[in-house]
Regions:
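Bacterial lipoprotein signal-peptidase II cleavage site
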Residues: 18-32
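Periplasmic-binding protein-like
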Residues: 112-123, 142-144
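Extracytoplasmic "Venus flytrap"
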Residues: 36-49, 54-79, 90-103, 122-125, ...
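Positively charged n-region of N-terminal signal peptides that target proteins for export
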Residues: 1-9
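Flexible loop/hinge segments that line or gate small-molecule binding clefts
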Residues: 134-164
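Hydrophobic core
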Residues: 9, 13-17
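Short, well-structured alpha-helical segments in soluble
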Residues: 98-114
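An alpha-beta-alpha
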Residues: 76, 173-214
């Protein structure tokens, strides 16, 4: 599990570098000297045995949202490609109106389709993830956007769940600092998801502090 997390996070951090390469490589090229970007790897693949070892459960919104979903799934694809693993993404039913049951159904489908690791993006996955992780105890879950260890209904830490939090405030700080250094002084911030979205609020706090420090 630790090895998977280290490689997944490394892949996600390398995403920006890979995406910045000006020349795409031909799919299937095994030349280790060539850089493969996430865009070179298909979003969907066909497993010979119908099983998919790594699953990604999307947050609300489109897979290609240029944000949490896309960044996380690109990391999954890069890891799977580098380690010859099968992968599949699942989008809970009803999109923005998805319920905990919808999210659980997506996780259960992933586990039943052979997933050994299920990566879930977004804090709204919490209730469904706790239920799924308890039922599928032999599957490892990666909870993206969780700021503390995940516990079960009895308050016990779930050993098959790894919690990873984005540090949005650091990204916001750099953005705020950079925009002022570029000469812009009349600033505003409009965060997506409304005023009660913790991730957007953290980004906004960082943005204001970065602009102030500049």
């Amino acid at each position: 599990m630790k090895k998977f997390l280290a490689l997944l996070l490394s892949a996600m951090m390398l995403l920006a570098l890979a995406a910045g390469c000006g020349e795409n490589n031909t799919k299937g090229n095994n030349d280790s000297d060539k850089t493969i970007s996430a865009d070179d790897i298909p979003d969907e693949m066909t497993s010979e045995d119908g099983k998919y070892e790594i699953a990604f459960i999307t947050d609300v919104g489109a897979l290609k949202d240029k944000s949490f979903n896309q960044g996380t799934f690109d990391g999954v694809k890069l890891y799977a490609h580098a380690n010859n693993k099968t992968y599949k993404y699942y989008q809970p039913a009803n999109d923005a109106q998805a319920t905990d049951d919808d999210r659980y159904d997506a996780m259960a489908a992933a586990a039943q389709n052979g997933a050994k690791v299920i990566v879930c993006a977004g804090f709204m996955q919490a209730n469904a993830l706790v239920k799924a992780a308890a039922e599928f105890a032999d599957v490892n879950f990666v909870f993206i956007d969780a700021s503390s260890p995940v516990t079960d209904a009895n308050g016990n830490i779930m050993n098959n769940v790894a919690a990873i939090a984005f540090q949005e405030e650091q990204c916001g700080y750099l953005a705020g600092y950079a925009v002022v250094m570029e000469g812009y002084k009349a600033l505003g911030f409009a965060g997506g998801g409304g005023g009660d979205n913790p991730a957007c609020c953290r980004y906004g706090y960082g943005f204001v502090q970065g602009a102030n420090d500049a």
